Amino acid sequence: MASSVMSTATVATGANAAQASMIASFNGLKSAASFPVTRKQDLDITSIASNGGRVECMLVWPPINKKKYETLSYLPDLSDEQLLKEIEYLLQKGWVPCLEFETEHGFVYREHHRSPGYYDGRYWTMWKLPMFGCTDATQVLNEVQEAKKAYPQAWIRIIGFDNVRQVQCISFIAYKPEATKFSMFNV
């Protein structure tokens, strides 16, 4: 019986030696000298992590009588040439242009939904049908002009709809009523 116990211990010791050689021992951290050191040479104000130097040139959006419309709506109104470029972009992407208008609330407000952000439960009225098969940006711009004549006091936006993924991919204001045109710089 003693011989059987010894042989088991000998086998176990041999297995432990094999396992120990399979796992490398921890040698500590590598020295910092092996890593390359890169430092910025010029230390101008744009390389500082804080934006403290740029605070003086920033403007705050005035919350009184300044409504939030769509993405980038704080920019000046788009000219016809700029609208054509935006429309050409959505046509190049293969999206279907569609016009929508709103006669009462062209801005974000909370009527049916309480979550923050753009999705507030409001719906715009579609102008005619989506322009399936449209390949000319001037056709879309002509529809914007027609909508302006029919509803001069309405907000008009152009959306680009991807009919494969069935999602709205782009949306921007094409026209704001005269009473709401303002500049954030004329406070």
UniProtKB/Swiss-Prot annotation:
**Does the keyword Lipid biosynthesis belong to this entry?**
no
Record text on subunit structure and interactions:
Heterohexadecamer of 8 large and 8 small subunits.
Q: Major location, coarse class? A: plastid
Q: What is this protein called?
A: Ribulose bisphosphate carboxylase small subunit, chloroplastic
Instruction: Tell me which residues form the transit peptide.
Output: 1-56
- PANTHER family from the xrefs? RIBULOSE BISPHOSPHATE CARBOXYLASE SMALL CHAIN 1, CHLOROPLASTIC (PTHR31262), RIBULOSE BISPHOSPHATE CARBOXYLASE SMALL SUBUNIT 1A, CHLOROPLASTIC-RELATED (PTHR31262:SF10)
| Anything else known | The basic functional RuBisCO is composed of a large chain homodimer in a 'head-to-tail' conformation. In form I RuBisCO this homodimer is arranged in a barrel-like tetramer with the small subunits forming a tetrameric 'cap' on each end of the 'barrel'.
* Biological function: RuBisCO catalyzes two reactions: the carboxylation of D-ribulose 1,5-bisphosphate, the primary event in carbon dioxide fixation, as well as the oxidative fragmentation of the pentose substrate. Both reactions occur simultaneously and in competition at the same active site. Although the small subunit is not catalytic it is essential for maximal activity.
One GO cellular component this record assigns the protein to is:
chloroplast
Q: Report the locations given in the UniProt record.
A: Plastid, Chloroplast
Q: Which GO terms describe its molecular function?
A: ribulose-bisphosphate carboxylase activity
